[in-house]
Design a protein with these regions (language model features):
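A short, well-structured juxtamembrane/interface segment
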Residues: 8-26
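Short, well-ordered alpha-helical scaffold segments within catalytic/effector domains
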Residues: 4, 16-17, 87, 91
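Exposed alpha-helical structural elements
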Residues: 6, 19-22, 164-170
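Glycine-rich phosphate-binding loops that contact phosphosugars or nucleotide phosphates
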Residues: 25-168
Length: 170
């Protein structure tokens, strides 16, 4: 449920998430904020996005980000990742990011969570409850979400063609 509903005509499509294409335009840099396993998914996401867009992408530990003066502006996109959507450090980092940019996107599993409510847009991963200590299910769907985001961003910013995007998704 993470990937299939977000692919139309072999292209990434976030219309079911109510995310307009304009959200992906004019992005100067991206900061990914998370804790724990979600941060490791963010590191993979950084590589995917940076390799496609050739713009600065940083990964920040939420517990540190919230105490720093963030280097973000209105053209910055901040992607916040949390399995539960309630991680307090990540939520506080999101609140700080919202003071600087309207381009905040959360990747969360739990519908209606605090992080989802306070983000400009949200991608629900639909992973279901995580039973094990090792968060493999959540990690996998977070990485899949980054894969689609990297493709959508690159296509919207004309870094790859529609045909390249289809190859990327296919």
């Amino acid at each position: 449920r993470t990937i299939t509903p977000r692919i139309k005509d072999m292209l990434p499509d976030f219309s079911e998430d109510a995310i307009a294409d304009s959200f992906f335009e004019n992005v100067s840099d991206i900061t990914i904020v998370a804790c724990g396993t979600a941060m490791y998914a963010g590191m993979v996401g950084k590589t995917m996005i940076q390799n496609r867009l050739h713009i600065p992408v940083t990964v920040a530990i939420a517990s540190e980000f919230r105490y720093e003066e963030p280097v973000i502006n209105e053209k910055s996109m901040v992607i916040v990742v949390s399995q539960s959507g309630e991680t307090i450090d990540t939520l506080e980092a999101l609140r700080l990011a919202n003071k600087y940019t309207k381009k905040t996107l959360s990747i969360v599993n739990v519908k209606g969570s605090s992080i989802a409510r306070e983000s400009s847009y949200v991608l629900y991963t639909h992973a279901g409850p995580e039973i094990a200590v090792a968060s493999t299910k959540a990690y996998t769907v977070q990485v899949a979400s980054f894969y689609l985001l990297a493709c959508k961003l690159a296509m919207t910013q004309q870094k790859i063609s529609v045909e390249e995007a289809r190859t990327f998704v296919g």
